């Protein structure tokens, strides 16, 4: 069950319509998870600085069980997400940062229990 949070200082009118759905589909493909398990939040218009600059930028946080736990996996994931984000947001790679957070099944609650028991 991946969780993706895309924060950007781009104003909402510069974020392509439907980005959350395309990011959901891309994440499902990149991470090898069913799209109906992917959760995406897009937050435009934030006060942000990346590398000391307030020029347009974005930060993607990816949390998931089992697929973001190794440097090798994340190197591959990073390449694919950078390709997606540079196209969608028209930002250079130096203006995007990705953070990976491995989760355990007991850290996600769903339908009154945690994923461990589902």
Swiss-Prot record:
- Asked if the Swiss-Prot or TrEMBL record annotates the protein with the keyword Membrane, the reply is no
Q: Which Gene3D superfamilies match?
A: Macrophage Migration Inhibitory Factor
The UniProt keyword set, sorted, is: Acetylation, Cytoplasm, Lyase, Melanin biosynthesis
Give all N-acetylproline modified positions.
2
Q: Which domain of life is it from?
A: Eukaryota
Q: Which reaction does it catalyse?
A: D-dopachrome + H(+) = 5,6-dihydroxyindole + CO2
Oligomeric state and interaction partners are given as: Homotrimer.
Query: Which named protein is this?
Result: D-dopachrome decarboxylase
Q: Which organism is it from?
A: Homo sapiens (Human)
Organism placement in taxonomy:
Eukaryota, Metazoa, Chordata, Craniata, Vertebrata
Gene from which this protein is expressed: DDT
